[in-house]
Amino acid sequence: MERVTAGVLAAVMALGMTGCANSGMSGTTTDLTGQYGTKEEGQTEGTGANGQTGQAEDTGTEDTAMEEKDLGAIREAFEYSYTQFSLNLLRESRKQVQNGEDAKNTMVCPLSVMMALEMARTGADGDTKQQMGAVLYPGMSAEDGSMVLGRICKSLPDAEGARFHMSDSVWVKTADDVFVPDENFLDTVKTAYDAEVFGAPFDETTCRDINRLVEQETDGMITEILDQIPELAVMYLVNAVAFDAEWETPYDESQIQDATFYAEDGSGQEVSMMYDTTYRYLTMEHAEGFCRAYKEGYDFVALLPEEGLSLSEWLEELDGETFHETIRQENDTMIETGLPQFTGETDLELKDTLTAL
């Protein structure tokens, strides 16, 4: 089984924003979720492109057909936009992780970062909201991007062979008479993102609760995202994503052999290499690779820059459209592949990364 920690984001905003979760809380934390996102009986709430809720009415099959047609085009635009955002995030995150050390790996989860920032964008206004939308959804409107993001997150497969779990939460400091959260914002994130809402004193018990619940939501893959809560923090938004999938066709023992894996700096290390033959070949200018299927329709994608081109150089020239088209246009050329068994972990503060974006 291949286990991938998709990621957790704790993003401290201007007023100390960020947060988390659902059971096993200390006695100082209060579940406020039931107070938000409610609607009167007989009303149907829909989330608009800007994340606001409103009543939806049946406008007939013609409008529905047009909506589905438009959604197809919007979703395609989102796929390109999301890929570009992902590459932008990886490039800037890698710069922070490397910090002059080429031997370090970088793991980021664009979906987790995007969801947490989308919740923050929902509560923003004016230039801040516009700028956040431009970063999150390059090349398309933030309203359309937000709509598709919510639909995709709710439709991703979650089954025995491929577990996908996402948790969104808002924590509000209750021991603060100065800060009062906007109820419309809390209603929106509860309705649009199924976020839970908690009140807490923002002391050491709150810090433990957040870490404990992130660990729970990620099946133990992430055990800590906070070591302390700043005095000025008044609200937390936290998104946690966990992905745990099996290969559609597992490697058998005869396909796993000891081999030497060479890193970018030329150093070699002994690894267990998983060999296979595939017809899902990927090629682009200055790189080639392959796809391999997980269960439930998920794919693992590996790309290798051509010899003589560093990973940083390749990432700098790669754009979302090229990357997306490469994956869409895989060809059935038979190739032999070797993939090392590996684990990876990245711990980084995203403040500088997001500022660079």
Question: Where are the regions that the model predicts?
Answer:
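Detector for small/aliphatic-rich hydrophobic stretches
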Residues: 2-8, 13-200
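Residue-identity detector for glutamine
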Residues: 35, 43, 52-55, 84, ...
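Short amphipathic beta-strand starts and helix->beta connectors
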Residues: 95-103, 285-287, 320-323
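Non-catalytic, conformational "gating/processing" segments within enzyme and secreted inhibitor domains
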Residues: 103, 142-306, 330-357
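Extracytoplasmic/secreted cell-surface and envelope-processing proteins
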Residues: 126-133, 310-312, 346-348
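Short Gly/aromatic-enriched secondary-structure transition segments
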Residues: 132-136, 251-258, 313-321
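Internal alpha/beta scaffold segment
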Residues: 305-331
